[in-house]
Each structure stands twice: as structure tokens, then as C-alpha cells.
Amino acid sequence: MSERIYPIPVDIEKNALIDQDTYQKWYQKSIEDPTSFWGEHGQRIEWFKPYTKVKNASFNDNVSIKWYEDGITNVAYNCIDRHLKDRGNEIALIWESDNPYSDKKITYNELYEHVCRFANILKNHGVKKGDRVSIYLPMIPEAAYAMLACARIGAIHSVIFAGFSSEAIAGRLIDGQSTFIITADHALRGDKTIPLKDNVDRAIHIAACQNVNVTQVMVIRRTSKIIHWVNGRDFWYHEEMPHATPDCPPEHMNAEDPLFILYTSGSTGKPKGVLHTTGGYLVYASMTHQYVFDYHPGEIYWCTADIGWITGHSYLVYGPLCNGATTLMFEGSPTFPDEGRFWEIVDKHKVNIFYTAPTAIRALMGAGDSFVKRSQRTSLRLLGTVGEPINPEAWKWFYHTVGDSRCPILDTWWQTETGGHIITPLPGATKLKAGSATHPFFGIQVQLVDPQGNILKGEAEGNLCIVDSWPGQMRTLYNNHQRFVETYFSTYKGKYFTGDGCKRDKDSYYWITGRVDDILNISGHRLGTAEIESALISHPAVSEAAVVGYPHPIKGQGIYSFVTLMAGTQPSATLHQNLIQHVRQEIGSIATLDKIQFAPHLPKTRSGKIMRRILRKIAANNFDNLGDISTLAEPQIVDNLIANRQNIEEAA
């Protein structure tokens, strides 16, 4: 772990919403008197009927979580209507097309009309409060309209990432018993066209075989390509939009009414439908957005996440819009038409706050600095990372090269299940360490425990748990509360178990070490894959690395590393040996790499996450049953990895 501490920039500290003293006072109050603290901060959103009950939560036995349970509000009203008087003509949403020469700017007044018309189309087709509406759309403004329209009328949306296969869509339709789906004819990403409507048609057929019948399909035109059409079921959004009225009263929603279901992508088994409700989620998403990103009115905020993930829900749509922010949505790829696209968008729209994934950072770092240096990036004030731990080398590149050593990096740790940030720096309150998520957000009581559940004090490494509820927490798994209890609360009684490992250093900074199932057991010694990956990436020749375990006849598990080299660097026996020595030097001899496979590319989803389950199977020579790889951005990469695997002799 890096021990250098990066101070808070003077200009950030001077103007920040939260300074070090405020953080300490608020955090102490949030732990000692959570009812009073969250009762006060619940007022940040508007309520049609104020709450009198703040917190009613227990992690014991059957687990029950309720916040603001007698309050009445509406998420879309808070994200749009309440801003119209003062911000109606200000930009709510900037949309940057896949095409570098095309964009749109939508004001809050325009957003209101779009969402109301969308909501009325849904109502005209019989959608009502409590109905589940599936959304399978690319990153286009209509995706945000669809979410907000559902929230406006009380329908429960289930957004399905537009990179998912027909089988994955069908599984979500079946679990949610959804009979209405919103999709587009196609999606555009880089030089690719993805047939969304075809995927939906196949998914509907699969779902019908399980007695779930989708009766209505709204189609948004993104291209002019011909698509299969079912009369009486399918209808065009653009044909109904002009006839829908531009006003739609917001449904009065109880704070604990469901807002959305979002399915976690497990590698095996039935998908888990994480259920978030209305009041507490919006309080937490908006509060974390405001304070973690130190958001000031008028700033341009860009979260690169897809709306199919929780980050897109909380920090592209709901959090920013609830705060009256200008939020940027990007349809395309960070490498199209070349690796300078992100930085060109930053300059074009004068982005102040930029929030992206470590995988994207590492990939762009590997392309070289020239793509960054041809842009100005002078508008940037804050940088953020999300989705996985960021290794110190990538953190430093992001800080020094992209941020010109002046923009604090907000290394945020949280989950689909948490609704919002859990461990995170605050720009005006937190000195930084490269690769550390730093400290808990308000109201978050974290504990490190050993496998037996013993609480670890001081400098320690263990399993990360949270011992009390917070407003943004998931309430259950849709239609499967028993699985919810077993998955998150049965391992350590009375605690929410995150499934992640974590280190706490001597300064009480927290470092996420990766999923517990990403812990390798090498000759009885536990090693986190994230730690080994960080060591590899710290070598100047390495752009990206992914480490997995594989069966080893002596050690139990061996260390198998997939390595992508910097542009212009060629694999060699010398480099192979240098990397082994480098990791031994960084971590110790126990971390000796058993296999190194040089790979031009790693298998990633369209959201940029490395699909490690595929790498595990290749490393174990179990590649005959890789499962669904249709969610990969480039499925053909897998064939190259299999052909060049390094453990053929073990299999023989």
C-alpha cells in the first residue's frame, strides 16, 4: 500500500461543502444518534406528506429495513418539478452521441415535458402503480425519460444492461413477471450496431416458455434499419409521443414503495433482483452525490457509467437530477474514434467532475499519454473512480496525467446493494492515499471481522461488514426475502456482510482488497488478486493485468496472470522473468507467478468490467463450458485466450 498522503488542495478546502471538522462532527452524530441525523437530512427532498418515523431497521432474524416509512413523496417530482421555478431553463441533461459530431442539451423544462409525455404513453397502455416495466435501452436520453416516467406513475422499473443476451433478458423478465418492455431498434457503439429489438424478441419467446407473456413492446427508433415487428404487441415511441399530453401529475408514493429492481450479474444461478425503495434511496443518492462530488450549482458533472448498472441509476440519473445538476450521458466508447474521446468530451462540454471506472483508466493509460495531452482538461476540478479497487499505479496516472496533479481523486467503494457510496473520500475533508477508498460516509459503521466473526481492531485485514442500516440500503431481493437474509446476513449474525475483503492501515484508511472469492490460498497463505494485479501494473511495461487462481498439484492454488502490455512493448522471455521478479519484490516470494499469459486484450463487458469467471475457467482448462459470453464487448477475444493458454501441459 502506498504511504504517501496527498493533501487537500487549498482552493478545494476553501470552497468545499464539507471540511474536516464538519466531517468529524457529522459522522459522530450520524453514528451516535442516527434517527436525529437522518431525520434532519431527510428534509433535503420534498415530501407531499412529511414523515414522523425516521428509522425502523433490524439486521437480526428475518431482517427488516424501513426508512421514513410514513412519508409520502415522488422521485420524479424531486428530480424535475421542484427545479422548474428556479432552474427550468438550465440544462438538466447533456447527451453526447456515439457520433463525435452530434449532441443534445435538454433543459429541466424540456425534461419535464419529455417525461410527462412518456409517462402518459405508459398510462395509455395500461401501466399503473406497482407494475414492473423492463427497460432495455442504449445510452440515449429516452433511457432516462423511461426511468423517470416509471417513477412518476409509480411503476417499478427494471433496467437491463443493453449488452446482455436474450437469455439474460428472459431471466429478468421471468423473475420480475414483467409484461411490458421498452427497447430500441438498435444500439450504436463505436463502429458496431447491436440488434436490441432482435434480442428482445428472442427473450420474449424464452420467457413465454416459462409462462411469462410480454404483451407490449415500446420501440424507440435509433437507426433506420428494418426490424422484426409483431402487430398488436409492438409500437413505436415516436408515433405516440406527439399525441401524449405534456402534463402528468406525479403519483403519491409511500417512502417504502418500490422504486426499481436491478439484477446483479452472478456468474451462475438465478439472477438476484435487488429491490430499492423510494424515499430513503433518493435521500441517500442525492446526499452522497452532493457531498462526495462537492457539487456546486452550475457545474457540469459526467458519470460514464451505463444506466444498466447501479452507478448509472444513482449517479447519472437520480442523484444529480435530484440536486438540480447538469448531468452528462455518453452513448459511445472511450476508444472510438480513438483513445482521446473522453478528454475531447471533457473539453467540448467543459466538464468539472469526471467519474469513471478503473478499467477504463488502465486501458487509456496503456494507450499512452499523447491522447490525453492533446486536450486541455482545464475545466476539471474533481476526478472519481467506481466499480472496483483502483491500483496505485493507475490512480497516480489518473491524478498526475489526467488531472495535472491538481484534481483530488474520489475512490468510491459501494455496491448495487448499498444504493450509494459507503467508503469514500470527501474532497474538502479527506487527505488521499493512492488506492485507498479512505473513510466511511455518514451513518456507515464498518467492521472488519475474521472468518469466525471476531471483530478486528486497529491495523488489520479481514472481511468487510456494516453493522447498522442506512437509508439507501436495499430492502430485499425481489420475491425472495429468504435468499436476501441468507446471502447478506447469515454469515455474520446481526451484520450486513459485503462479500469484500478489506485492510485498515495504521491511519485508519480502508483499502478494498477485492471479493472474498478473489482471495487465493497459496500454500496456506491468503493473497488478494487485487494486490497481485497492482504489483503487476506498477511495472512500466504493463498496461492491464488480471490474476486468477488455478489448481496446482503442490500449492493447492497457483497464480495465473493475464497481462496486457503497453503499446509498443513486445512479449519476451526476459520480460516474463522480469515480471515474476517484480511481483516477488513488491509482495514477497509467496506471490511468485506460476503462469503468465501475454494477452493483447482481456475479456470485458461493455461497462468495462473484466469477466474473471471466464479467465478462471481458461486457467483451469475448463473452457468447454464458459457459459454466456454474449455480454462481452468483444467475444472473439476468448478464442485467442484459449489458443494461447499457458497450462496445456497440466491438462495433458
Curated annotation (Swiss-Prot):
Protein name: Acetyl-coenzyme A synthetase
Catalytic activity: acetate + ATP + CoA = acetyl-CoA + AMP + diphosphate
Binding residue positions for ATP: 387-389, 411-416, 500, 515, 526
Species: Bartonella bacilliformis (strain ATCC 35685 / KC583 / Herrer 020/F12,63)
Domain of life: Bacteria
Presence of keyword Metal-binding: yes
Maturation and modification: Acetylated. Deacetylation by the SIR2-homolog deacetylase activates the enzyme.
Top-level EC class as recorded in UniProt: ligase
One GO-annotated biological process of the protein: acetyl-CoA biosynthetic process from acetate
Keyword Magnesium on entry: yes
GO CC annotation, single: cytosol
Binding of CoA, residues: 189-192, 311, 523, 584
Modified residues (N6-acetyllysine): 609
Family: Belongs to the ATP-dependent AMP-binding enzyme family.
Cofactor(s) the protein needs: Mg(2+)
